[in-house]
């Protein structure tokens, strides 16, 4: 199916955001908003979001990929994935405004873009959203961070000669020891929950 791509701009809390809308001649009733992950913009690594959008548009879906505030060509301060709900809501709005036949929107997100989509839907229960496609969502909790630090940092640190020298000479602070013990306990608690 043939489609047309066009640059679109829209306003979110006073800032102008930019995106690319790929729209087939006769779009399906459900459209897709691509939510990028990490510090990327609407093209994506190796043009992955361009290729994805074009493939979906050729299959009959209207697709909007856009830059959050502070990323790519969009204005405003840079956002983290847990602070882009307004951007996502505005993107859905412009998509439905530009393609009035669209009744529902599916959010497609990669990595922390997937987490942003999930958080958006959880926070808003937006009735316009009828689907989520979440690829590799990224979530960090205190317990998962502690487990990662114990596994990757502290294990390696115990093998370093200078650590043992600092410990033996009394240069390791009480705060560091307490932090290590707390993180080890958190990591152990998480491991017990997973088993």
Descriptions of predicted regions:
Residues 1-30:
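N-terminal cap/lid segment of alpha/beta-hydrolase-fold proteins
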Residues 24-67:
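Short, surface-exposed "cap/lid" segments of acyl-processing enzymes
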Residues 39, 68-72, 139:
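Alpha/beta-hydrolase active-site loop signature
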Residues 71-104:
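Catalytic nucleophile-loop/oxyanion-hole region of alpha/beta-hydrolase
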Residues 106-109, 135:
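Short beta-strand immediately N-terminal to the catalytic nucleophile in serine-hydrolase-like folds
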Residues 108-117:
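Gly/Ala-rich beta-loop-alpha elbow adjacent to hydrolase catalytic centers
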Residues 119-123:
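Active-site signature of alpha/beta-hydrolase-fold catalytic machinery across serine-
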Residues 127-195:
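The alpha/beta-hydrolase serine catalytic core
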